[in-house]
UniProtKB/Swiss-Prot annotation:
Record-stated family: Belongs to the phospholipase A2 family. Group I subfamily. D49 sub-subfamily.
InterPro entries in the cross-refs: PLipase_A2, PLipase_A2_Asp_AS, PLipase_A2_dom, PLipase_A2_dom_sf, PLipase_A2_His_AS
Residue span(s) of the pro-peptide: 6-13
Disulfide partners: 40-132, 42-58, 57-113, 64-106, 74-99, 92-104
One MF term in the entry's GO annotations: phospholipid binding
Pfam families: Phospholip_A2_1 (PF00068)
Binding residues annotated for Ca(2+), in chain numbering: 41, 43, 45, 62
UniProt-recorded name of the protein: Basic phospholipase A2 beta-bungarotoxin A-AL2 chain
Subcellular localization: Secreted
SMART domains in the record: PA2c (SM00085)
Gene3D superfamilies: Phospholipase A2 domain
Length: 133
């Protein structure tokens, strides 16, 4: 079993950070994984119009990462950053305008948005070809 685990690529550090932010902001009965295939934009890719407020959070996050990727040498999916979870909010550290700070702010904004948006069960695992045009 352990030898097989060695072949599993590690999660990028910022994905782990983002998952921790989400866990901090969402109701305890939901796991971060329940957001991975929700609506038209939560999860890999995205198309069409967001189907609700929660999906809109993911749409904004995707666009934020797209903007960050336009910064020289900035890969938002692998960029590490520093942050603190405190008093029901998230604080990002680092100089404004740096890749790390921008990516942290993208994740922070999305996680807080998730915490303020209703999770609608029927929008999980939707037929994206039909609903996301």
């Amino acid at each position: 079993f352990l030898l097989g685990a060695a072949n599993i690529p590690p999660h990028p550090l910022n994905l782990i950070n983002f998952m921790e932010m989400i866990r901090y902001t969402i109701p305890c009965e939901k796991t971060w994984g329940e957001y991975a295939d929700y609506g038209c934009y939560c999860g890999a890719g995205g198309s069409g119009r967001p189907i609700d407020a929660l999906d809109r959070c993911c749409y904004v996050h995707d666009n934020c990462y797209g903007d960050a990727a336009n910064i020289r040498d900035c890969n938002p999916k692998t960029q590490s950053y520093s942050y603190k979870l405190t008093k029901r909010t998230i604080i990002c550290y680092g100089a404004a305008g740096t890749c790390a700070r921008i990516v942290c702010d993208c994740d922070r904004t999305a996680a807080l948005c998730f915490g303020n948006s209703e999770y609608i069960e029927r929008h999980k695992n939707i037929d994206t070809k039909r609903h996301c045009r």
